[in-house]
Structure formats: C-alpha cells, structure tokens
Amino acid sequence: MHQFVRVGFLVAALGTVAVTSAASQLLEQPEPDRSTSDPVMLILRGIANSESPRGQLDDGAALQYAWYAGFRGEVLDVAGNTGPDSLQVRMTLDRIRDDPSIAAIYGFSGGGYNARHVWAGLTAAQRERIRRVIVVGSPGVAASDFPGMPYVVIKPDPREGHMAGPKALLQWEAGPEAPLELGE
C-alpha cells in the first residue's frame, strides 16, 4: 500500500513539475514578431558619440513603443547628424520613397530634428502614407513642423535625463508597468 502511495505521489509531483515547466515556458515566449506586411515605424537614432558611434538610442524602448503603437519598428542604422543633406535624412527619404509599408516616423534627439527635414522632403502622396510622427528629446521641434499630419507626438526629455526619453515615451504609451523587452 505504501509503495502505491509513494508512486502516486511521485507521478503527481512529476505531473505538477511538467505543467509548471510548460506554463513557465509559455510565459517566457517573446511576443511574435510583427509580420513583414505590418506597417513600419522607421526609427531615427540620435547623434553619434564615442559610446554610440552609430547614434544614440535606447533601441529596445523605441522598438517596444513601435510594437505597442501597432507598427513593426525598424531602426535606421545610421547616426542622426542633423541637417537637410545629412546621410540620415537622405537614407530616410530613400526608404520612404522605396518602401510603401513605412507608415510612421520616430525621431530621437538628432533623429527628431531630422524628422522635420524628412517631412519637408516628402511629396504630398508620401506624406499621406505617414500616419504618425513621434519626436523625443529634440527641443524646438513642434507639431507645427509637420503640416497636415494629424497625429504628432512631441515629448521633451524626462527628469531622468535625455537617454531616458524613449523609455518614458514607452511608459506613456503602454503604462508604467510596460516591460522593457517584448515577452516579459
């Protein structure tokens, strides 16, 4: 009798471990990537420095924001040195002209200043495809810099500092308990 009880207990314990393990794995699965057919939010980095030679940005928070906003985020992998003829502006204009799935622009710091130049360089038809413009940490950039765009979000630097801007924007969109990475 005692052996049957022990075996029964062991089977129940193993079953509990298996169910707990399976549930744990389900919880740890990241959110599925947005389909390549989903609209794209093109994310523009800030200016480069010695720590971020390709441009400053909290990539994770910016991509998470795009996801929460209903877009597939893509970080344009070039520093946001500013100006209408900068490499970032030229690359962004080329991407928008060549890729009809781009439906939003997110600019951080120097990328936010460049978002103005990008908007000015778009044709009326290209502007109609853009559904949202986001600018974070770019003092002096205003919604009026994007005429005809009904959905513009301009966020100043938070108290935590310039580099905390993308995370603060994410928490504004998704709430203060927003996970820092998809799937958390």
Regions found by a protein language model. Give the residues of each.
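Bacterial N-terminal signal peptides
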Residues: 8-17
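Residues at the C-termini of beta-strands that transition into short coil/loop
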Residues: 45, 79, 137, 155-158, ...
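C-terminal catalytic histidine-bearing segment of alpha/beta-hydrolase fold enzymes
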Residues: 154-184
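Serine-dependent carboxylesterase/thioesterase catalytic core
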Residues: 89-164
